[in-house]
């Protein structure tokens, strides 16, 4: 991408770069670019009318934001911008916005190569700072001062350890998903069932194996709600690939977290670009010892997109999958890990099966052994309108003894031994009936006798 922005002395950060943006609010009103982008188009149009901007009906949302910012600066306003850095091959970069799914637009913020070198910035860094309007002959807003990098002091970014050099460990801290059933009318037991059959930890790499119409999207929404409720310290990102637009809107309105999407009418290259931005952002946050969770719907569609854009190797597997196509989606999924001395990246992704596509079956087989937790949804259970349609006997987590107390673990094993002779439908019906009579899993276990530890595990 070409740009007419030139490096200038005002684009170089000085010793005041670490000051909070409140320190430079003296000459005018502060306009927060992030808050502006979150406004509805109707609100932006009303604001543009107040500023007497012409032809607002013909402008797209990003163009409208650009026009409002430019007019506000002319009237003496100061702008604070935030975005996720994408460094281009030429050395300079732009701050992309999650509000527009990291799509390039006129309201992106230019960062010069000297600023990138000074603070050791890389693709995926979340940068906040003061920006200025484009000068004559320039097309983009430019960053003047860096206030924060990944929500911390900029000096910390220069001394962080690269993600690939961090030591991965098994998840050893539980990611609480259980939500209390405070009323008898509450019919959602999905997160409580997951806690019983496949407990999640920070750093988990989990697959939700789902045939069509088994409730995987609703299950993801319930998991997202549980994460934001029980783990407020976790940074949640929901990544929707090749999805229907109405499902994107539903997810955005029901999830308190960052929801980014690439719908089915967009090219495969766009799916790939969005996924790369999300995983790079997550890695940068983990380097700052933060806990990040990515919910992906679906890993299968992401692998299809990579299969479309990857250069042909001449070796084609069954179903039309290129031999080299799955390396990059595996690298995406494999980034999930618990980090020694702080930080974790958890990825919970859906894998589609029984779609009638041979390619989907090949993709699932390739990903089958890569996760350390698996939740299997059953079409037969869903056809009976029993939700969550989880096949308990086929779902589970590796090294669950690191996440669960020994006494509770023993009771979970006894529960599996009771359920094992049953069919998949009878097992989930039996468990749901028991859960309906209790508010929490703790109460459920109180009903069970304290058993001895089984000699042969499950």
From Swiss-Prot:
Residues 78-153 form the Rho RNA-BD domain. The keyword Transmembrane does not apply. The keyword Transcription applies. It is an enzyme of class 3 (hydrolase). Its EC number is 3.6.4.-. GO terms for cellular component: cytosol. One of its GO terms (biological process) is DNA-templated transcription termination. ATP binds at residues 201-206, 213-218, 244. SMART domains: AAA, CSP, Rho_N. It comes from the Bacteria. Gene3D superfamilies: Nucleic acid-binding proteins (2.40.50.140), P-loop containing nucleotide triphosphate hydrolases (3.40.50.300). InterPro entries: AAA+_ATPase (IPR003593), ATPase_F1/V1/A1_a/bsu_nucl-bd (IPR000194), CSD (IPR011129), NA-bd_OB-fold (IPR012340), P-loop_NTPase (IPR027417), Rho-like_N (IPR011112), Rho_factor_ATP-bd (IPR041703), Rho_N_sf (IPR036269). Pfam families: ATP-synt_ab, Rho_N, Rho_RNA_bind. Residues 1-26 are annotated as: Disordered. Keywords: ATP-binding, Helicase, Hydrolase, Nucleotide-binding, RNA-binding, Transcription, Transcription regulation, Transcription termination. GO terms for molecular function: ATP binding; ATP hydrolysis activity; ATP-dependent activity, acting on RNA; helicase activity; RNA binding. CDD domains: Rho_CSD, rho_factor_C. Homohexamer. The homohexamer assembles into an open ring structure. Belongs to the Rho family. Facilitates transcription termination by a mechanism that involves Rho binding to the nascent RNA, activation of Rho's RNA-dependent ATPase activity, and release of the mRNA from the DNA template. PANTHER family: TRANSCRIPTION TERMINATION FACTOR RHO. This is Transcription termination factor Rho. The lineage of its organism: Bacteria, Pseudomonadati, Pseudomonadota, Alphaproteobacteria, Rickettsiales.
